Amino acid sequence: MGGAVVDEGPTGIKAPDGGWGWAVLFGCFIITGFSYAFPKAVSVFFKELMHEFGIGYSDTAWISSILLAMLYGTGPLCSVCVNRFGCRPVMLVGGLFASLGMVAASFCRSIIQIYLTTGVITGLGLALNFQPSLIMLNRYFNKRRPIANGLAAAGSPVFLCALSPLGQLLQDHYGWRGGFLILGGLLLNCCVCAALMRPLVAPQVGGGTEPRGPQRPPQRLLDLSVFRDRGFLIYAVAASIMVLGLFVPPVFVVSYAKDMGVPDTKAAFLLTILGFIDIFARPTAGFITGLKKVRPYSVYLFSFAMFFNGFTDLTGSTATDYGGLVVFCIFFGISYGMVGALQFEVLMAIVGTQKFSSAIGLVLLLEAVAVLIGPPSGGKLLDATKVYKYVFILAGAEVLTSSLVLLLGNFFCIGKRKRPEVTEPEEVASEEKLHKPPVDVGVDSREVEHFLKAEPEKNGEVVHTPETSV
């Protein structure tokens, strides 16, 4: 991709794997929690919005849809901003946008205005926080990156369990307008998290001002060269197919229980079970992925997590009572947590640190399309058949397909491809090929010595340096 470029500074910065990285992890935990839980948490205000504006449930549901679409669909824009201005400034602006959108929504007089404020402005603000926080986390952690990603991903279920009751409490005491205003103030904490994202600085030589190591070539604002990487292409296709069905069961499981005659309170408790299991599944999956013997096979572990999730959906379609749905939510929470902990760790392992900011933006854009297709397609299938199990079968089939795409694509297209020829001197030396004569050529050391000493005019000038003299 042509156009403007930005220099990100010196190379050779080693991930500290701790230190200030724990503060970055804490900030990423909070940002991930807000980003994923907020679109679901605002749903507690939907009934009051329906009464206020005289609209239907489908009209209010667009608020969450627009929030998710902005979170996923603005990925490339976030990548450009991060590569141009850096993570911390982008997150500070994003925190202001997220707060401003909710504060402005508290003064809205129509649902369209809420779409623009809560949906577009707050959604954009959360997107400008979510992606840079992941980029900073992956710059601060290398050896401990899997467990760091798992702990950060745990912010989603933790905040979901906290924000939904908080939203209900605010609505009961202050109404939806007061609740939106207070939530807007709460989102200013994103700016605090942005302040924690301290850029890594290259080490200095002898206290001087010159950074150690070579300068990195200027980086494109949006690096489309990732599409030349077969590993990235396979990951992007698999992730897009996965998202078609991944979010469908949590959307429909409560209605599925109510359709069986389960009371509303018990039906809603299913999501609490799912979220509680998810809290522990994510860091556990990150810890397992970080083990030395497991980490080289993280792509296959991610494929297994997707397969596990799809298989759980298929078995959940056979549930006939509340107990069956409880068992489904337990296993779905485990598999869902594994997927959440591994998805960005695997992407980072595929594309590397330098291309991660562009890669994650492009992947989120592709997933945005799938997010807008998946749950609505499940709803249309439900309207046509009136049978919930078909919705779960469709979701399971989509996630299973994505796991097979990743597994087979990685095994046949990546795992078995020939290793490229070694061109770097350091790599050549490690392969013991440096200065190694062909097998069929014999070398007489006496003739070589005579040639160098007696006939220098045929050989050119011989220069002795401390590095070449023995």
UniProtKB/Swiss-Prot annotation:
Residues 1-17, 83-84, 131-149, 201-231, 289-298, 343-355, 413-470 are cytoplasmic. Disruption phenotype: Deficient mice are born at normal Mendelian ratio, with no apparent defects at birth. However mice exhibit impaired exercise endurance with abnormal neuromuscular junctions innervation and lower compound muscle action potential amplitude. It catalyses: (S)-lactate(in) + H(+)(in) = (S)-lactate(out) + H(+)(out); pyruvate(out) + H(+)(out) = pyruvate(in) + H(+)(in). Pfam families: MFS_1. GO terms for cellular component: apical plasma membrane; basolateral plasma membrane; lateral plasma membrane; nuclear membrane; plasma membrane. The modification Phosphothreonine is found at residue 465. The keyword Membrane applies. It is found in: Cell membrane; Basolateral cell membrane. The modification Phosphoserine is found at residues 430, 469. InterPro entries: MCT, MFS, MFS_dom, MFS_trans_sf, Proton-linked_MCT. Residues 39-61, 106-109, 171-179, 253-267, 320-321, 377-391 are extracellular. SUPFAM superfamilies: MFS general substrate transporter. The chain crosses the membrane at residues 18-38, 62-82, 85-105, 110-130, 150-170, 180-200, 232-252, 268-288, 299-319, 322-342, 356-376, 392-412. Keywords: Cell membrane, Membrane, Phosphoprotein, Symport, Transmembrane, Transmembrane helix, Transport. The keyword Nucleotide-binding does not apply. GO terms for biological process: lactate transmembrane transport; plasma membrane lactate transport; pyruvate catabolic process; pyruvate transmembrane transport. Residues 429-446, 446-470 are annotated as: Basolateral sorting signal. Proton-dependent transporter of monocarboxylates such as L-lactate and pyruvate. Plays a predominant role in the L-lactate efflux from highly glycolytic cells. Interacts with BSG; interaction mediates SLC16A3 targeting to the plasma membrane. Belongs to the major facilitator superfamily. Monocarboxylate porter (TC 2.A.1.13) family. This is Monocarboxylate transporter 4. It comes from Mus musculus (Mouse). The gene is Slc16a3.
